[in-house]
């Protein structure tokens, strides 16, 4: 039970890591009319779940969870470098590092000490932070992956609710609809070969590029 409570804390919107300040290109996509209602937002997020979460973030989270457990920091560093390199725009790379840096400050205050080997990993990407926290708090891997996806989905949907805008009830309905795909995505991630880890979300990359010079912005990405 305690591990579940620690997991809820790790994905809480109140966690002071600034997750709510990023839209990952969604803000520009909405301004240009690519995303304009509940249905188009669902399609936008589903494509990211299948083209990035299932084939990049979750597979690397799985790798890091194992590697940190066996203290293979050299290989863990490889995957941390890989995920940052896979962020195809400047603002997405900055976001990855900013989230990681926020966790690097937070985790020691939550009782997870960072060594000279683990600090550079967490400071680079929040994926390493999730993996390390799960290893220290003995959170099962499948629960960790589900929680990571929930955290991403909730932030993305709430950004859409604010920007389109949608009603709060519509946002909650969308979360129910999209979480139905989570088990499928995790199963796909568990089987995904290491030599195929990567993402293919060209629309998001274009939107993120354009967002970097968008005149009026609420979000940092």
UniProtKB/Swiss-Prot annotation:
Localization of this protein: Cytoplasm
Any one Pfam family match given in the protein's UniProt record, by short name: UreF
Keyword Chaperone appears in the UniProt entry: yes
Gene3D superfamilies reported for this sequence: Urease accessory protein UreF
GO molecular function annotation: nickel cation binding
Superkingdom of source: Bacteria
GO CC terms of this entry: cytoplasm
Keywords (A to Z) from UniProt: Chaperone, Cytoplasm, Nickel insertion
Residues in coiled coil: none
Function of the molecule: Required for maturation of urease via the functional incorporation of the urease nickel metallocenter.
Known partners and oligomeric status: UreD, UreF and UreG form a complex that acts as a GTP-hydrolysis-dependent molecular chaperone, activating the urease apoprotein by helping to assemble the nickel containing metallocenter of UreC. The UreE protein probably delivers the nickel.
Record HAMAP family: UreF
Family listed: Belongs to the UreF family.
Protein name: Urease accessory protein UreF
Organism of origin: Vibrio parahaemolyticus
Encoding gene, per UniProt annotation: ureF
